[in-house]
Each structure stands twice: as C-alpha cells, then as structure tokens.
Amino acid sequence: MVSKNQIKLISSLHQKKYRIAHQLFIAEGVKGINELLQSNFELEHLYVTIDEFKSVSTTQKTVISDADLKKISALTTPNTCLAVFKI
C-alpha cells in the first residue's frame, strides 16, 4: 500500500528542484527500469501493479493500484511499474 506522503514525494520528483533536493529521480517502464538496475544506479523503491508483482525479484517493491499509479505517473497512459532511484 502506498501512503499519501509517498505519493506526494513521487509527484514532487517531476520538478527539477525536488529531484535535486531529494537526490532522487523517477523511471517508468519495464525496459527502462531494467537498464537502470543493470547500471550503477541504486534503487530506492519500486512500485508495481499486481500483474507485475511476481515477475520482479527485488525486495524493495510495493504493490500499487492502477489509480495511484496514474496519479504519480508523468505519462498519459502509465506503465505497470515505476521506480525511484538515487542520483
């Protein structure tokens, strides 16, 4: 379950000043997240829909509803997962 504070934090990361202040950034989509996981970026947290929950093998994951994912996504049609990485 995603708290309101987490939703506010992730939504704030759409703006550059908050990404710099929190030293975090957002990645959306399975392919982009997998590429970042294979690189040197450190995963802060991963939010996935129930459909993708079993296919992800990290311990830092949370199931998120489609409605909440739509709230925090920068895309008009959100993907099934969203990750927050440390800069």
Predicted segments with their positions:
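Boundary-proximal intrinsically disordered activation/regulatory segments immediately upstream
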Residues: M1-D51
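Active-site regions of enzymes building and remodeling cell-envelope glycoconjugates
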Residues: V56-L69
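Short loop/helix-cap segments at secondary-structure boundaries that form the rim of catalytic
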Residues: E52-T59, L75
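Short gly/ser-rich anion-binding loops that grip negatively charged ligand groups
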Residues: Q23, T62, K71-A74
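A generic secondary-structure signal marking the coil-to-beta-strand transition
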Residues: Q23-L24, E44, Q60, N79-C81
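Hydrophobic alpha-helical segments and helix pairs
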Residues: K70-I87
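Short beta-strand elements of ligand-binding domains
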Residues: V48-T49, T62-I64, F85
